[in-house]
Amino acid sequence: MVSVSQSAQNYFLNLLKKQKYGTNIRVYVKYPGTPVAKCGVSYCYKDDVTRLDVAFTMNKFIVYVYKPHIPYLRESKIDINVEECNSQLTLIAPYANKCYFIKNNDLKRRVENFLNLNINPQLSAHGGKVDLMNITESGYLSLKFSGGCNGCSMVQKTLKEGIEKQILAKFSEFKGVYDITQHNRGNHSYY
């Protein structure tokens, strides 16, 4: 669980008073389990909360954390450091860089974890998601988009410029990715 000091809670409450009613706080990790993991804090609006978020109730507000990121935020502490005339919000997350993949995990499971921890949080901002459907013997991943990504006019750019580049950087075993989604453009499509 994320621990938030009383002074940090007061700081957040002061900030939240200036936001739209129902706004809370999100604690997140970018690139969890890697040497370049970065933790952060942001506003979390009602519409941003998904079924994959876990709510931690504080005094008068809620801190949301994306469920797959919880192991990386274990024993995390948010506090305010005051030095002379300055104060700074600090987030200490000792496990953000720790890799939780078990060495003998099969490749499919590692790719699914990578998608859930690194790709899907970005896609969820647009109401979208991507799932691994198959790994071919020739080294390609077949992916299926859903939600806001289904029918989105930017899906090929997302696939090649975003997802494929990240997967190839993380997994040397693969040659590329391709989309097997039967795209149906509709109100659910982001673009």
Curated annotation (Swiss-Prot):
InterPro entries: Fe/S_biogenesis_protein_NfuA (IPR017726), FSCA_dom_sf (IPR034904), HesB-like_dom_sf (IPR035903), NIF_FeS_clus_asmbl_NifU_C (IPR001075). Its cofactor is [4Fe-4S] cluster. The keyword Oxidoreductase does not apply. Keywords: 4Fe-4S, Iron, Iron-sulfur, Metal-binding. One of its GO terms (molecular function) is 4 iron, 4 sulfur cluster binding. It comes from the Bacteria. It holds the Pfam family NifU. GO terms for biological process: iron-sulfur cluster assembly; protein maturation. Binds 1 [4Fe-4S] cluster per subunit. The cluster is presumably bound at the interface of two monomers. [4Fe-4S] cluster binds at residues 149, 152. The keyword Chaperone does not apply. Belongs to the NfuA family. Homodimer. Involved in iron-sulfur cluster biogenesis. Binds a 4Fe-4S cluster, can transfer this cluster to apoproteins, and thereby intervenes in the maturation of Fe/S proteins. Could also act as a scaffold/chaperone for damaged Fe/S proteins. This is Fe/S biogenesis protein NfuA. It comes from Buchnera aphidicola subsp. Baizongia pistaciae (strain Bp). The gene is nfuA.
